[in-house]
Amino acid sequence: VSTTCESEGLPCISTVAPWQPWFIGQQGNPGDPASWKPFGYAYHFFWGLEDVISVYTNMWAQLSTNKQVGGLFPNDGDGNAWGDGKVGFPPVLSEKGYKLIDPGRYQNLSDDFSAQINAFKSGNVEVITGVMIPPDFTTFWNQAKQKGFTPKIASIGKALLFPQAVEALGKQGHNLSSEVWWTPSHPFKSSLTGASSKELADGFMAATKRPWTQPIGFVHALFEIAADVLKRVDDPTDADKVTAAVAATKLDTIVGPIAWNGAKLPPFAAKNICKTPLVGGQWRLKDSGGYDLVITDNKTAPNIPAGGKMEPIV
């Protein structure tokens, strides 16, 4: 959608994707950083790979491991970005003293992860990470258990965002870890309604009879930003005026402050990206059944309260 808006000269605001795959994937030559150019109409707010790597390694540092890490990266935009030797996990893990065992890219919806599991067992892996779709992680985790492979830590992007995906694993989902973008305990409120994060989540659960999920905050923030932008333009049909208003945004939202001011970004992405805070958490099995997501590391965003410490998978 962002690519189409850019080509048509229509202002666009997007979210819920790490900024590197979003930005780099839309470039004419993703493999040539020197050719990357900013966009005229497409703007994005979310965290980046540098943030998820920091969150994961901060969580891992709470437990004693041999620093052997297994990588699970699919052959898609996210997997290729996360596993990239220049901008992904490999160089940063190496800097931090971890050894990454990467068996290579696999196809989404694979039904056999024997090669990956065998590579991890041979490499004495105690930590696994990656970015998987939920059915693939379910397949991998069930097969790993069948083959007697249980790492101390499993920090997986994308697959573990929703409670339903973890509940599908039964009791085997206990202490799986993931990045955490938004929760009811985040200390932010809506600029539209004044509702706190907890009030927004409670309202969603009351209306839908379903558990809250992380994207709720970001979807709400899209409406906050759109309303704020339209309040600041005298002609909402003028694409260039609307785009200028987007670029000038300075708004405290339910997911944190939004401003496209280039903070904590490389020069090539400074115009079009706004970073949002990220922390890490573990899914904990409740005595009553089901799971709670507990924030276990907030070093990257100390204003977001932690609810516990990392525990090993057993």
Language-model features: locations:
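Structural motif
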Residues: 52-55, 105-120
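Periplasmic-binding protein-like
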Residues: 10-16, 68-73, 124-134, 140, ...
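Segments of small-molecule ligand-sensing domains
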Residues: 203-216, 227-295
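Extracellular/periplasmic periplasmic-binding protein-like sensory domains
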Residues: 19, 47, 144-220, 232-233, ...
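Hydrophobic alpha-helical
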Residues: 1-6, 111-112, 118, 125-147, ...
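Extracytoplasmic ligand/sensor domains, especially the bilobed periplasmic-binding protein
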Residues: 1-104, 154-178
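Extracytoplasmic "Venus flytrap"
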Residues: 72-84, 135, 187-190, 211-218
